Amino acid sequence: MSNLKQLRTRIKSVKSTQKITKAMQLVSASKLTKIKNQIAHSNFYVEAISKMMSTVLSADIYDFPIEAQKFFNTETNKANLLIVMTSERGLCRTFNYMIIKQVKSDIETLKSKGEKIKLIIIGKKGYEALKKPYESYIDSYFELPKNHDENLMLQIKQKIMALVANLEVSNCTIYFNRFKNAMTQSMTKQQILPIEKYHDDSKIEEANYEYEGENLIQNLINLYVNSQINYALLQNRASEEGSRMTAMENATNNAHDIINKLVLKLNRSRQAIITMELIEIIAGSEAV
């Protein structure tokens, strides 16, 4: 009888866990739908800014102030800025592992070359993984809010702009997961600085923008950095929720299989007990 009690307790426990994983799956699915809508709206903005930046730079008809020139600087004696985007929570398969693995590999490569390194880490999981081995390289750490927040994007942008303005870094690379679908996310390493500058006479007429302000280039740089950070944050958030939704769906299905096996085992145990009792009753009646 004690065995039956243990089985019933285990079934109850697994059912309780199944309810939790199912709820987490539904929450992630809801968040993913919302983020995918945000990505759809932001993609046009990112493409437009990138095209405008490319056109203006290749036309080469606007003045480049000293501050703006720092974003095109390819000096190698400055630090490499690595922006690492992870998550606040786990339960999302290899989402964080792949990013952290790539970042560690690149840090070791840069160290072997004697290059300077600065880290900006977004997400608790990334900070926990990188704090102990690379604490001296960490410049900033940002916690992820529960929902996509433009304030975080602005804080990261301001930090990047300050580091470049102070001539502390010469290039900037963002590490994030690019969203393909709920089942598939790809670890992405995207360099956003220095900005490539080249000349193309065919772009001169196309680049004649009517602009009122001190400097078109500097404002375009601000918009460009903003758009790249926002794009990476949205892609990473969608990848996180997609990965967690898939993980929780698998967990829910696994719980269902375990429950079925436990119920079958419970029924067989009960049947064995009943059979044993019947045998004892029959044997007792024959003895009488």
UniProtKB/Swiss-Prot annotation:
Query: What is the membrane topology listed in the Swiss-Prot or TrEMBL record?
Result: Peripheral membrane protein
Disulfide pattern: none
Which InterPro entries does this chain map to?
ATP_synth_F1_ATPase_gsu (IPR035968), ATP_synth_F1_gsu (IPR000131)
Matching entries from Pfam families are given as: ATP-synt (PF00231)
Keyword line: ATP synthesis, Cell inner membrane, Cell membrane, CF(1), Hydrogen ion transport, Ion transport, Membrane, Transport
Its Gene Ontology cellular component terms are: plasma membrane; proton-transporting ATP synthase complex
CDD domains according to UniProt = F1-ATPase_gamma (cd12151)
Compartment(s): Cell inner membrane
The biological processes this protein is annotated with in GO are: proton motive force-driven plasma membrane ATP synthesis
Q: Name the major location.
A: membrane
- Write out the GO MF terms: ATP binding; proton-transporting ATP synthase activity, rotational mechanism
What PANTHER family does this protein's entry cite?
ATP SYNTHASE GAMMA CHAIN, ATP SYNTHASE SUBUNIT GAMMA, MITOCHONDRIAL
Family statement:
Belongs to the ATPase gamma chain family.
What's its job? Produces ATP from ADP in the presence of a proton gradient across the membrane. The gamma chain is believed to be important in regulating ATPase activity and the flow of protons through the CF(0) complex.
Q: How does it assemble?
A: F-type ATPases have 2 components, CF(1) - the catalytic core - and CF(0) - the membrane proton channel. CF(1) has five subunits: alpha(3), beta(3), gamma(1), delta(1), epsilon(1). CF(0) has three main subunits: a, b and c.
**Protein name per Swiss-Prot or TrEMBL:** ATP synthase gamma chain
Which organism's genome codes for this protein?
Answer: Rickettsia bellii (strain OSU 85-389)
